[in-house]
Amino acid sequence: MTINEIQDEIIEEFADFDDWMDKYQLLIDLGNSQEPLDEKYKVESNLIDGCQSRVWLQADYVDGKILFTAESDALIVKGIVALLIRVLSGHTPQEILDADLYFIEQIGLKEHLSPTRSNGLLAMVKQMRMYALAFNAKG
């Protein structure tokens, strides 16, 4: 699936819920469904700066595609990073760099997050794009 196809799928899933409490529950469920991050990756260098919660992000470059794994100590943040991984993991660095992450606005996520969580979301996206830039430069 393309990045946009995945985003459209997420938009449809969130459209099934009218109440934001249900959408938060969906985020929590998504976070809990993620494979836990291997303890060896829970190191300072994998922590994302700018997040109030602790978020570890690991990126591996395999066969020209970036595979992201992550974990957070906060339930909703864990769900947010799970969404980002779902959208961006398994794509080429250039696809990630070119991606317009419109699903964030479309599902209303940005407007329903506290300012600190919103900053954390931006920090997660920035870090994923930084990995894409680095892997793109390596070719």
Description of each model-found segment:
Residues 81-91:
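Alpha-helical support elements that line or immediately flank enzyme active sites
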Residues 72-73:
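A short interface-forming secondary-structure element
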Residues 77:
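Hydrophobic (often cysteine-bearing) scaffold residues that line and stabilize catalytic clefts
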Residues 65-69:
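General beta-strand recognition
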Residues 90-107:
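Glycine-rich phosphate/pyrophosphate-binding loops
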Residues 3-11, 15-54, 61-64, 104-123, ...:
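N-terminal intrinsically disordered, cationic/polar leader segments
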